[in-house]
Amino acid sequence: MIENKLKIARVTNGNLTQAEVAEKVGCSRQTINSIENNKFVPSVELALRIAQLLHVRIEDIFFLT
């Protein structure tokens, strides 16, 4: 299972809303919400876009449990 710390990274690296992250990475706010709640696993491309936007390594946000 893949879990994430997206909400923590989103708030600490720019205090961005779900909608702001979604707009900047090219997906819906609902997608970001689903990722944060571990209901959806993002594609590698989307995960990389999120990490780049938040200036963190992908493995700092997404990890296997």
Please give the residue ranges for each predicted region.
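Recognition helix of helix-turn-helix/homeodomain-like DNA-binding domains
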Residues: C27-V41
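DNA major-groove recognition helix of helix-turn-helix/homeodomain DNA-binding modules
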Residues: E45-D60
